[in-house]
Design a protein with these regions (language model features):
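Extracytoplasmic gate region of multi-pass secondary transporters
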Residues: 13-17, 198-252
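C-terminal transmembrane helical hairpin of 12-TM major facilitator-type secondary transporters
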Residues: 217, 243-247, 253, 258-312
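Flexible cytoplasmic inter-helical loops of multi-pass small-molecule transporters
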Residues: 169-190, 381-388
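Intracellular juxtamembrane helix-capping segments at the cytosolic ends
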Residues: 20, 99-113, 304-317
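Cytoplasmic helix-loop-helix junction between adjacent transmembrane helices
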Residues: 89-127
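Hydrophobic core of transmembrane alpha-helices in multi-pass small-molecule transporters
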Residues: 72, 84-100, 209, 290-304
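Conserved MFS/SLC helix-loop-helix module at the cytosolic interface between two early adjacent transmembrane helices
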Residues: 44-83
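Helix-loop-helix hairpin linking two adjacent transmembrane segments in secondary transporters
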Residues: 125-175
């Protein structure tokens, strides 16, 4: 439920691009840069939050993240300057999402189940976040239609505070995890040094950059893009919602089959599939049917990357510092998110079209497939077992 709310609130921000820019007389690059800051803030604070969760427990981190999240949404409702926009929806919401989302919650879920059920748990957690995208985006659109965008943000800010209560059940499964692989004592700095010298880990970080580029660009700009080509604003909201719905199944299936299939090959397939889907979407004339099909296919591949990616981190280094090390991987994801969101707005303002960003997404998908291919699916030498299935 916590992941549902955290991811759901954030997924609705693309709906505010047009009303916020029109109300303040800004170009789309302004709010795009704010959303880019949000993604970068999320990435930086994800690594920090992961380290704090490993040290002090997930509950305290989630409560802190909830406060930042609610404050950022509330301040966005009264935004009348660029610096306030960047501070609210950018810095504060980004920090809030970092403390209430995958990087903090998924490691706690992994520790709560036996080793042979870890990938299943990762799939369930990722699917829960996707359910939030499916459920919350139409609700946000309805709130905007009924009360206006300012009141809608106020309602969301108050609702976000409820996430703090949902963190309490995580208490037994957060903080220090038993280093079940071999009882090797390692501090967080040593874990970071070990990871940064690991070639497969660095390839994983670079590939996850592409996932962030795709996801953030489409989430932030799809509603405005569809409106520009002649669709009703409701179509944009439902497109993002369909992505969330199909991702529930994609993420769950990805988590379930990651126990049986090669995680690196699964990731190669996902990224190539995205490139094919985007290419066909841009080449075939736009219609309601093509929007629905594209949204469904992209949704199925959307966060299907998370179970095998986080699973590879657990295989390589174990679960002791998984929140922190996955946070570093996620920082790569958010650097991609920053690039996708900001570049989308910048190119639109300078060229009047999103086409170049779509085709860049195709090229990056191919790049991601290539860098995942040589990843080694085995543990570091200090772990007792040569291969830990998770």
């Amino acid at each position: 439920m916590l992941l549902l709310l955290s991811f759901g609130f954030r997924s609705g921000f693309g709906l505010f691009v047009k009303p916020v820019t029109e109300a303040n007389g800004w170009g789309r690059e302004v709010i795009s840069f704010a959303l880019a800051i949000q993604n970068l803030s999320w990435g930086v604070f994800a690594a920090v939050s992961g380290g704090l969760a490993d040290r002090f427990g997930s509950v305290k981190v989630v409560i802190g993240g909830t406060i930042f999240y609610a404050a950022g949404i509330w301040l966005m409702a009264g935004v009348d300057s660029v610096w306030l926009l960047h501070t609210s929806v950018g810095l504060l919401v980004g920090a809030g999402v970092a403390g209430t989302s995958f990087g903090v919650i998924l490691p706690a879920m992994v520790r709560a189940v036996p080793k042979n059920q870890r990938q299943w748990a990762l799939g369930v957690g990722t699917a829960a976040g996707s359910m939030g995208q499916f459920a919350m985006v139409p609700i946000v659109q309805q709130l905007m239609d009924t009360y206006g965008w300012i009141s809608a943000l106020n309602i969301l800010a108050v609702s976000a505070l409820g996430m703090a209560l949902l963190a309490i059940p995580l208490a037994p499964y957060s903080g220090k995890a038993a280093n079940e692989e071999n009882h090797f004592e390692q501090n967080i700095l040593a874990a970071l040094k070990e990871a940064l010298k690991h070639r497969s880990y660095l390839l994983l970080v670079s590939g996850f950059f592409v996932c962030g580029f795709h996801v953030a660009f489409i989430t932030a700009h799809m509603p405005a893009f569809l409106s520009d080509v002649g669709f009703d604003p409701q179509v944009g909201a439902w497109s993002v919602s369909i992505i969330g719905l199909c991702n529930i199944f994609g993420a769950y299936i990805s988590g379930s089959i990651s126990n049986r299939l090669s995680k690196r090959y699964l990731l190669c397939f996902i990224y190539l599939g995205r490139s094919v889907a985007i290419s066909l979407f841009m080449l075939i004339p736009f219609s309601l049917t093509t929007v629905v099909i594209f949204s469904g296919v992209m949704g199925f591949l959307w966060l299907a990357t998370i179970p095998p990616t986080s699973g590879l981190v657990a295989i390589m280094f174990g679960t002791r510092y998984m929140a922190f090390l996955y946070g570093i991987v996620f920082l790569g994801h958010q650097l991609g998110s920053f690039s996708g969101v900001w570049l989308g707005g910048w190119l639109y303002d300078h060229r009047g079209s999103y086409d170049m960003v779509w085709w860049l997404g195709v090229a990056l998908g191919i790049f991601a497939a290539l860098v995942h291919w040589p990843i080694k699916e085995r543990s570091v030498a200090r772990l007792a077992e040569p291969l830990n299935k998770v």
